[in-house]
């Protein structure tokens, strides 16, 4: 009986060092109480387990049998646990949490490392180990910390080092609860600095391979940066791997080497191995995955022959042992709560990646708009912490920065630049401009903004997307045709000015009742609207959006009309300047010829010096005019190319504007020999103080389409047929 009690007491002491569930801990407490009652009745000498741990290193082990004749060793009075340090901890301070037991305060193992071991920036190849390094001492935290919620229901907890992006290490309290890894910056924090669901993660153990390296656990999740944690020993790494496997597989059944994925998204083992083998190694201790074991491409290939003998004998070589990796496939990744609620189901998503200019450097940030604030996150998965938050009320949106970054827009407050953002495409830029205009409460029309560094096609896409986004953000409905119905279905601008879209039709049949109809990719006109009342549209004029005429939706009709008109006006001005410059050059050349003749006549006379001075000035003026003529020719060529592109888009859209007779193409029947003044577009009022502006000529186009006898193509064909009859008659 006495031997059984002694062995049972030793067994309970061994259980204090193991990770136990709450049920086992309760049973252990009951057995301990029974054992204490038996020992007190039998007269056994019972000692507290915590006092044994404190005096284990300095005092001999207590006898296993009761020896009453041996005097009891003197024990110092219990002065209570040491207080927490008030000053900041040294750089090499390291703690490891010991598993909790019932009725005890959490214990932590501390050790001190030198500064060289804490940094991975520089590695040493010295293989000598210091004997005094890594000695462990135990201390207990105060009793009021024993009930802290951080580690109450934790499966395992410890202070581990986390590897930062540039190789630095930072200490975190890592706790595993349920199926999540929680990282706290301090044990006094109530909210975790990082929360990582273990489902869908791959955990890799990277052994220590040199003096300056550490035992590392690498946790990789698809779409995120890997999390690298440093542990003290291989045994601790195996404990963490075991607990992580139990934490996830305990919900569905027994612990396996690989947890099966959910049946809704099956992932075969061969596909998983193929996917893992295609990943590029990001650490010195990683390699290519083959049959669940990670092998290294570097040293292992060189020493493979040397290690073959030891492997044949049933042992593992040093290099191979360092590269053994335990990979746990824990199913498909579940989106976090913040990702599920990040406006993914809204009509217009108010989040996305943008390039942000910070300290003269462009950085990609995940941006989202929430509660009239523009919030910048480092990554899409890290939504609980943000870099900066900008209130949008009172801000002004200004597109453009320079020619190198054409898709850039800025946020200004009281004339001061708050943020500089760059989108990845014209649609993305228009979406963000519409969102920011709606959130800032601005009454600015997206087309009233100046897009200085993008062309007509891109600006049309930006403006149209911005208008659509603005209407969605304000819960307004854009009708398929603004000339149908009342003004309540049109685009209602905050300033009260009615803005009309192009008459390019969109599909009404494919739109469901859940979402409001969206206008096509046409561009709205700026300035004055037509004074005529809206009329009922001709159903024959409705164009279905198919592959044959999909190019019509690539441009904004009215914007191209206005741009073509502006380019034609500019071309006329340049041609006039060119003609005037040519006449001036001819006059200067004639004067220069006369001066040279006069100098030859007055050779050796007094007026020769005056004539030579005049000739020098005349030649200088000729050079200036010649340089001006070259610049004018280049500008004229550029304007002609732009006009050609605009007219090509006009042919696609069926515009009313026509090219000049000098630039008309004889192959196209649309290019008729008539001037711009005879076109229907001239009847619209396009006067503005800023110059030519886009106009909305829908009513005029409908009038021209309603008259079948006035078709220019038909008149052209009849005239040609009459000419052929006259030729045949002669």
Swiss-Prot record:
Pro residues bias spans: 60-85
Chief location of this protein within or outside the cell: cytoplasm
Lineage, uppermost ranks: Eukaryota, Metazoa, Chordata, Craniata, Vertebrata
GO MF annotation terms: actin binding
Sequence motif: SH3-binding, positions: 71-74
InterPro entries: AFAP, PH-like_dom_sf, PH_domain
Motif SH2-binding 2: chain residues: 451-456
Organism the protein comes from: Homo sapiens (Human)
Motif (SH2-binding 1): 94-97
Region (Disordered): 47-91, 119-140, 252-292, 512-537
Spans through the membrane: none
Gene3D superfamilies in UniProt: Pleckstrin-homology domain (PH domain)/Phosphotyrosine-binding domain (PTB)
Localization annotation: Cytoplasm, Cytoskeleton, Stress fiber
Composition bias, Basic and acidic residues: 268-283
Region ranges (Interaction with F-actin): 594-637
Subunit structure: Monomer and homomultimer. Interacts via its C-terminus with F-actin; probably involving AFAP1 multimers. Interacts with activated SRC SH3-SH2 domains. Interacts via its PH 1 domain with PRKCA, PRKCB and PRKCI.
Modified residues (Phosphoserine): 282-283, 548, 664-665, 668, 679, 687
Coiled-coil segments: 557-648
Note: Knockdown in MDA-MB-231 cells resulted in loss of actin stress fibers, decreased adhesion and spreading on fibronectin.
Modified sites of kind Phosphothreonine: 675
Name of protein: Actin filament-associated protein 1
Occurrences of domain PH (ranges): 153-249, 347-441
Effect after changing residue 77 to A: No effect on tyrosine phosphorylation
GO biological process entries: regulation of signal transduction
Tissue occurrence: Low expression in normal breast epithelial cell line MCF-10A and in tumorigenic breast cancer cell lines MCF-7, T-47D and ZR-75-1. Highly expressed in the invasive breast cancer cell lines MDA-MB-231 and MDA-MB-435. Overexpressed in prostate carcinoma.
Source organism, top-level taxon: Eukaryota
Pfam families xrefs: PH
GO cellular component terms, semicolon-separated: actin cytoskeleton; actin filament; cytosol; focal adhesion; stress fiber
């Amino acid at each position: 009986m006495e031997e059984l009690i002694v062995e049972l007491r030793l067994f309970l002491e061994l259980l204090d060092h193991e990770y136990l569930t709450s049920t086992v801990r309760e049973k252990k407490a009951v057995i301990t109480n029974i054992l204490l009652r038996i020992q007190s009745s039998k007269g056994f000498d019972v000692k507290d387990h915590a006092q044994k741990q404190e005096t284990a290193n300095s005092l001999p082990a207590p006898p296993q049998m009761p020896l009453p004749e041996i005097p009891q060793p003197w024990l110092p009075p219990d002065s209570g646990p040491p207080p927490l340090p008030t000053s900041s901890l040294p750089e090499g301070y390291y703690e490891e949490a010991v598993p909790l037991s019932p009725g005890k305060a959490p214990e932590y193992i501390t050790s001190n490392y030198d500064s060289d071991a804490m940094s991975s920036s520089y590695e040493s190849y010295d293989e000598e180990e210091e004997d005094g390094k890594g000695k462990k001492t135990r201390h207990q935290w105060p009793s009021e910390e024993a009930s802290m919620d951080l580690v109450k229901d934790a499966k395992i907890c410890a202070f581990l080092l986390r590897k930062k992006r540039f190789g630095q290490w930072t200490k975190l309290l890592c706790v595993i609860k349920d199926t999540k890894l929680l990282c706290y910056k301090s044990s006094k924090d109530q909210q975790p600095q990082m929360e990582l669901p273990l489902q869908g993660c791959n955990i890799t153990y990277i052994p220590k391979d040199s003096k300056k390296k550490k035992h590392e656990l690498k946790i990789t999740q698809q779409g995120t940066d890997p999390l690298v944690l440093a542990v003290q020993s291989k045994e601790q790494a195996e404990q963490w791997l075991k607990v992580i496997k139990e934490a996830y597989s305990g919900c569905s059944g027994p612990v396996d080497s690989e947890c099966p994925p959910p049946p809704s998204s099956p992932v075969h083992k061969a596909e998983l191995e193929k996917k893992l083998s295609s990943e590029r190694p990001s650490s010195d201790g990683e390699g290519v995955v083959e049959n669940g074991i990670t092998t290294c491409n570097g040293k292992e290939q060189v020493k493979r022959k040397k290690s073959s003998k030891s492997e044949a004998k049933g042992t593992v070589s040093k290099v191979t042992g360092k590269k053994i990796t335990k990979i746990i496939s824990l199913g498909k990744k579940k989106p976090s709560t913040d990702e599920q609620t990040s406006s993914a189901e809204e009509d217009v998503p108010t989040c996305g990646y943008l390039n942000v200019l910070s300290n003269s450097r462009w950085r990609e940030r995940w941006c989202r708009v929430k509660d009239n604030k523009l919030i910048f996150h480092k990554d899409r998965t890290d939504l609980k912490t943000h870099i900066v938050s900008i209130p949008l009320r009172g801000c002004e949106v200004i597109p453009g920065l320079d020619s190198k970054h054409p898709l850039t827009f800025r946020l200004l407050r009281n004339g001061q630049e708050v943020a500089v953002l760059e989108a990845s495409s014209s649609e993305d830029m228009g979406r963000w401009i519409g969102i920011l205009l709606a959130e800032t409460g601005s009454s600015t029309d997206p087309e009233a903004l100046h897009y200085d560094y993008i062309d007509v096609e891109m600006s049309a896409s930006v403006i149209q997307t911005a208008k659509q986004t603005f209407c969605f953000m304000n819960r307004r409905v854009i009708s398929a045709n603004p000339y149908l119905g009342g003004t309540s279905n049109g685009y209602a601008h905050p300033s009260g000015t009615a803005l009309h879209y192009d008459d390019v039709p969109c599909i009404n049949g494919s739109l469901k009742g859940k979402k409001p109809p969206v206008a096509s990719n046409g561009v709205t006109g700026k300035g004055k609207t037509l004074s005529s009342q809206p009329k009922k549209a001709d159903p024959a004029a409705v164009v279905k959006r198919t592959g044959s005429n999909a190019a019509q939706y690539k441009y904004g009709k009215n914007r191209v009309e206005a741009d073509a008109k502006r380019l034609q006006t500019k071309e006329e001005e340049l041609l006039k300047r060119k003609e005037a410059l040519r006449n001036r050059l001819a006059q200067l050349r004639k004067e220069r010829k006369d001066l040279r003749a006069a100098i030859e006549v007055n050779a050796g006379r007094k007026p020769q010096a005056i004539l030579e001075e005049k000739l020098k000035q005349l030649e200088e003026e000729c050079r200036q005019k010649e340089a001006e003529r070259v610049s004018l020719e280049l500008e004229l060529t550029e304007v002609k190319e732009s006009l050609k592109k605009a007219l090509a888009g006009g042919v696609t859209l069926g515009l009313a504007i026509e090219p000049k007779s000098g630039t008309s193409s004889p192959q196209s029947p649309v290019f008729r020999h008539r001037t711009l003044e005879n076109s229907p577009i001239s009847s619209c009022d396009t006067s503005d103080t800023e110059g030519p502006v886009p106009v909305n000529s829908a009513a005029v186009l409908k009038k021209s389409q309603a008259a079948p006898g006035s078709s220019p193509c038909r008149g052209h064909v009849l005239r040609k047929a009459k000419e052929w009859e006259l030729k045949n008659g002669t």
